[in-house]
């Protein structure tokens, strides 16, 4: 979602309000009151800080401003199937039905400077004597995302590890980590 926002002209310094949101479904009458994990609200927040802290209200407002349809189209350009993304604001909080492999492939686009690499599970097969039976061709690198956007998202995801919700990963002793935490029931 944040990559979509950057591609649409937002910056990591753009400010979005982290404040309570309440939606009532006009058909069912069900009320939705999403929360931040901390149960706190922080007011006007830069996107970099929001991503680092995993602030749900900013993320929902960002999706609302960009438009769910535009976001789903962007995800399709990144290689995801559009039918995995429900056309609702809860998609901002992770309501998409993607597999761990699909999610890892999506994040690899950032690690590869905006290029998508189609994953393969089997690199090669050898018989018991070491004779090669099968070897996967080198994966193609498909330009998918503006390298500038990729760099900025990677930088923000590194902040999430260094200073944000993913800081426990620093115990691995590596300085090249980037990541995003978060789960939802919304």
Whereabouts are the PLM-identified features?
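Short, glycine/proline-biased beta-turn/loop segments that scaffold the active-site neighborhood
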Residues: 1-44, 118-132
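Active-site-adjacent helix/loop patches that line small-molecule binding or acyl-intermediate pockets
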Residues: 16-21, 35-80, 85-112, 156-159
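Poly-acidic low-complexity segments
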Residues: 4, 11, 65-67, 146
């Amino acid at each position: 979602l944040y990559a979509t926002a950057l591609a649409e002209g937002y910056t990591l310094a753009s400010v979005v309000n982290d404040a309570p949101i309440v939606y009532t479904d006009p058909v069912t009458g069900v009320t939705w009151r999403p929360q931040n994990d901390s149960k706190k609200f922080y007011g006007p927040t830069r996107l970099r800080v929001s991503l680092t802290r995993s602030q749900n209200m900013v993320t929902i407002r960002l999706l609302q401003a960009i438009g769910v349809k535009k976001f789903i189209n962007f995800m399709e350009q990144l290689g995801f199937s559009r039918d995995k993304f429900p056309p609702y604001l809860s998609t901002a909080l992770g309501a998409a039905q993607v597999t761990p492999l699909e999610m890892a492939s999506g994040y690899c686009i950032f690690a590869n400077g905006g290029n998508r690499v189609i994953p393969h599970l089997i690199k090669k097969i050898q018989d018991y004597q070491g004779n090669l039976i099968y070897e996967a061709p080198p994966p193609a690198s498909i330009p998918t995302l503006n390298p500038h956007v990729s760099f900025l998202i990677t930088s923000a995801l590194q902040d999430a590890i260094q200073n944000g919700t993913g800081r426990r990963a620093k115990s691995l002793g590596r300085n090249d980590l980037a990541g995003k935490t978060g789960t939802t029931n919304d």
